[in-house]
Amino acid sequence: MHVVQVHSNTNRRTKMSNSLALRRRTFLNFGLLGAAVSAALPVKAFAQAPANVSFIAPTADNPIRINFNENALGMSPSAQAAARDAVAKGNRYAKAEITQLHTKLCDMYNVPKNFLLLTDGSSEGIRALLGAYSRLPKVQLVIPELTYGDGEHFANLYNVPVVKVPMLADWKVDVAGLKKAVDGFDGFSIVYFVNPNNPTSTVTPASEIELWVKSKPDNTLFIADEAYAEYVSDPNFKSIANLIQDGLDNVVLLKTFSKFYAMAGMRVGFAVGAPAIIKMMKDQVAGEKLNYPGVTAALVSLDDEPFQEYSRASNLESRKILASCFDKLGAKYLPSSTNFMFFELNEPIHAFQKKMAARNILVGRPFPPAMNWCRISLGTPQEMAYVANELTKMRAEGVF
């Protein structure tokens, strides 16, 4: 019995030693990767890197925030400077700058001026559309079961019934299921889809969407929320904008500066669609009365191509770090086309959230029905190296 006990203690010491060695190796591997990534990114492509690009170990008061799909780099230095300068003009309305932004976006999307409306982020666009079409005598909102929640939120606010279509395997959007829900309804249908989808980060191929939109089903409006399109490299993705440019009047595109351009707190977005749709939306908003710093930052951000290149490269490297971690841990995750990733847990998301928060890392909220999955936003490469180390330690400790 004594020999067995000694053997057991020896095993425990060996396992503990192996675990500590694994954690040390992992920390060095991911830490060196984060440092190498930082050095490799095209920082010199612009005059000055964002002030918050350096990494500081998280604390309870200053956690790693990878829960809201924010761009951890912050706005480009030139956009920050423009916003600071605009504060001094805060006693004035930004009428000229708003007109400039409106015109610039119309030129970018090759549409007349009455095809576009500036909004306070894309959320105001969703609200305006639901508010406008809720006045119809019989209307429904059709959405994938697992998607961004603002569509459902505003539908409930305006008493619009919501039809949720179950997802396919690996949380793919069931376009045929959405179509069936529309075909079986004798009123007006609003089809809201996010592409790439949130929280899954996956692309719904253009081939599955365009034919349906082009068929112009009666009493149907398509809302395409492309908040993350700037990150996409998947050849199966194509913006719905080309259908609007071709003259289709049953679809509206929603865009935001919150994600790729790192302007979540500035609240600048826009909608592109046929004049009749844009006019209905205008009646639901307080005009294009955006804040001065936000408008000027948006104008500068659109022209700052070096920073856009840097932002894409940083996001790609952060994605590689997290994917590598998941691969090493054997965790199932979906392919990412955005600035976040969706992976499967071996426990409910609420429990995992608490464990990560105890390590001063904030991760995504629950997304029913995927209650054993977690959405992690992609921070800086240095942040993701830290997160990868923590996940590896948690797995070694048996708590993840």
Locate each region found by the language model.
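N-terminal secretory signal peptides and thylakoid transit peptides that target proteins
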Residues: 7-35
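N-terminal "arm"/small-domain region of PLP-dependent enzymes with the aminotransferase-like
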Residues: 34, 38-92, 107, 187
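Phosphate-binding glycine-rich loop
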Residues: 90, 100-140, 158
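Conserved PLP-binding catalytic core of the aspartate aminotransferase-like
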Residues: 167-169, 316, 326-359, 378
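Active-site pre-lysine segment of PLP-dependent enzymes
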Residues: 175-186, 199-222, 226-258
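PLP-dependent aminotransferase class I/II
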Residues: 250-334
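PLP-dependent enzyme catalytic core of the Aspartate aminotransferase-like
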Residues: 355-359, 367-400
